[in-house]
Structures are given as C-alpha cells and as structure tokens.
Amino acid sequence: MGIPLRIDARSTALVAVGGAVGAVLRYTVAQAIAGPLGTLAANAAGSLALGALAYEAAATDSVLSADAHTLLGTGCLSAFTTYSTFAVQTAGLAPRWMAANVATTYALGFAGVLVGRAIAATARGDRR
C-alpha cells in the first residue's frame, strides 16, 4: 500500500516545496487559532486530508501521480500537522486538560482519517 520510497533530487524538491506550503498553512492556522485549539484544528484537518490522500494512493487507478502524493502527503501535510507542538502544549496544561487534549486529539485524528477515506471513496464511487 502507498507510494514506493524514492530518494532523488525530484522527490526531495517536491517534499521541500510541499513542506514550505504546509508550514505556511500551519503558521496561518496558529495565528488564527492560538494555542492547543489551533494545534488540534491543524492536526484534525491534516488527518482528514491525509486519510483521503492515502485512500486515493491505495487505489490501483489513482488519479493522482506519485509526484502529487509526495508533494501533498510527505511534503505539505507532514509540515501542516504537528505532533511535537501537541506534546509540548499538552505537557503545559493542567492535568485534567492534558487527558482531555490527548483524548480529543486522537479521537479527531482517527475520525478525520475515516471521514477523509469516506470522502475519497464517495468521490471515486467506491463501495468498499
């Protein structure tokens, strides 16, 4: 499943360009929604998008090229989502909010992947 690993100048450039776009988008979200809620929003949205992208990548007749998957998945969405910020922000919360933030982040992350897959499946006309 997924895209085969390619380490060459082209795929490295695609990851760099996608990463730059994802980082700017992540920064924009952080400016619009400060603190743990902004991180939660970025991670949930990124999970949804990556769920759709991964579903599409797994299709034998994917409409996106391997380059597009590298640019969007490994580049853009990897830079957009952030586990390290989530961990640091969670550690700074009061204990009861720590548990709530962890539970909410994982619940929305998994739900986002499932919803993203469902959206991609519907767009493809799949019934799996």
Curated annotation (Swiss-Prot):
Main location: membrane
Membrane topology: Multi-pass membrane protein
Keywords, alphabetical: Cell membrane, Ion channel, Ion transport, Membrane, Transmembrane, Transmembrane helix, Transport
GO CC terms: plasma membrane
Subcellular location(s) per record: Cell membrane
GO molecular function: fluoride channel activity; fluoride transmembrane transporter activity
Tree of life domain: Archaea
Reaction catalysed by this enzyme: fluoride(in) = fluoride(out)
Transmembrane segments: 13-35, 40-59, 71-93, 97-119
An annotated GO BP: fluoride transmembrane transport
Record family assignment: Belongs to the fluoride channel Fluc/FEX (TC 1.A.43) family.
HAMAP family: FluC (MF_00454)
Role this protein plays: Fluoride-specific ion channel. Important for reducing fluoride concentration in the cell, thus reducing its toxicity.
The name this protein goes by in its record: Fluoride-specific ion channel FluC 2
